[in-house]
Amino acid sequence: MSNVNHNSWFEKGMSFAAYKESMDVNKEELSRVYDQLTFTDEDLAVWKDLSQRNWKGVVLTADWCGDASLCVPVIQRIAEESNIELRFLIRDENLELMDQYLTNGTARAIPIFIFLDQDGYEARVWGPRSPEVQEMITTARAGLPAADAPDFEEKQKELYRNFKQQISTDPAMWRTVIESVKAKLQG
């Protein structure tokens, strides 16, 4: 956990409505997940308990990111149920913050959700994917031809097209994010 206060980043961020309005690429997918997502009674009880913490959050994201089209709407809905106000920052416009949250110490992978306590200090960090989604994409990438193969680019585009379709339409994928975030926030 960071002992750096992130209130200024929170204040700089966009609301969910403003972020969604700014989208060009994955707005339809994000909206579909947001509108169709459902929670169990157990989920709702956890979200209610979390609402007592008076947290807020900063999200590093970008419209072009397929993972964000899955994770942002799921976690926005969790935040709404948990009384956690999220603010959204575009990754490439906020590299000073992004570089504090590199995946595996090197990658500017997004989305990254930085949950802040009532004083603006980091309480939890989640992202960029649930372990199950990471395993799925790792397995799929392993099936790609070598990077210098003539059909690599075509096969890679097909892989990401299929991945984007699955994560924006399959409630089982949404559930992996719910469970992963729930475990992180309760911890």
List each language-model region with its residue ranges.
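Short amphipathic alpha-helical surface micro-motifs
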Residues: 39-41, 68-70, 95-97
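Non-globular targeting/processing and membrane-anchoring segments
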Residues: 1-55, 80-81, 85, 99-108, ...
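Thiol-based oxidoreductase modules, predominantly thioredoxin-like and allied folds used
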Residues: 58-61, 75, 83-98, 116-118
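Surface-exposed, flexible loop/turn segments at secondary-structure boundaries
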Residues: 65, 94, 121, 131
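Local sequence-structure signature of Cys/Sec-based thiol-disulfide redox active-site neighborhoods
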Residues: 46-77
